[in-house]
Amino acid sequence: MVVSRSPGGYRSGIITLVGRPNVGKSTLINSLVGEHLSITSDKPQTTRRIIRGVISRMNAQIAITDTPGIHKPKTPFGKGLNEMTTCALSASDSIGICLPVNQKIGSGDRFILDKVEAIGPYKKIAIVTKIDRVEKRDLLLKLSEISDLGCNFAAVVPVSAKRAVQIDLLKDVFFENCLNFSEKLFFDHEKPSVSDQISELIREKALCLLEQEIPHSLLVEVEEILTDSNRVFIHANLYVERNSQKMIVLGKGGRTIKNISITSRLAIESFLGKKVYLRLIVKVVKNWQKSESFLGKIYLS
């Protein structure tokens, strides 16, 4: 993990963002880092990988980790996502707990707080997300609700990642509270692998075009990437669990998969800075979320 011995006085830290699905963690990390690192969607449980962004200042570095939303899993796939988050928490020294201002604190939030407490004595920062969606009075009620939790938060910071409201303040809070190491832990611009980023771009575009029932059953695997001087050739598989879902992904006359391919290709071209030839194949693997052998081979290994 450590990439170099630091000069005298260098400080660094790791903060992991946690919260229920769809509370704004991915939009937040993209805003904090200033890049599109993590997939965003209005559909829950969008993040399926551990995404890390790095913020550097003079003699200091913060690594921010985005995690899949913590939930009570019903399948081996859901269990695997929770295990990813637990591993990320174990490697952290501070936790950013995301609480959307427009949703009441419920059993899911308390489940997460209990899980965090069970893993270790972390310094906790409450991040009130999506404040652009409510009036000031509602924000004050949310802050009172957080106070009633009785948690020993190091700070409570309301933000709007979408409109970049108080994002710089949140960075300041991170640097004030999360610097526990004396070494540089990561390269300044560390990102997920190219293959992972491409698969996430494809899945993001697919989520924008598909019906509500499909997202949880959709998995994207980049099988092959070939490059020459002028173009990148990419072959990716889109896995679903039922033939009926495959028909939805394909669409009438293949229109939906064509639109997914076009929007994905444009996004990948912007990301890579090259022309892209994209081949998408839709495959059915029955109940893949429950297949430990499939998940181990394709996704969670």
Swiss-Prot record:
Spans annotated as G5: 159-161
Chain intervals for the UniProt region annotation (G3): 66-69
Highest taxon above the source species: Bacteria
Membrane-related topology note: Peripheral membrane protein
CC per GO annotation: cytosol; plasma membrane
PANTHER family on file: GTPASE ERA, GTPASE ERA, MITOCHONDRIAL
Protein name per the record: GTPase Era
Record organism: Tropheryma whipplei (strain Twist)
Recorded name of the encoding gene: era
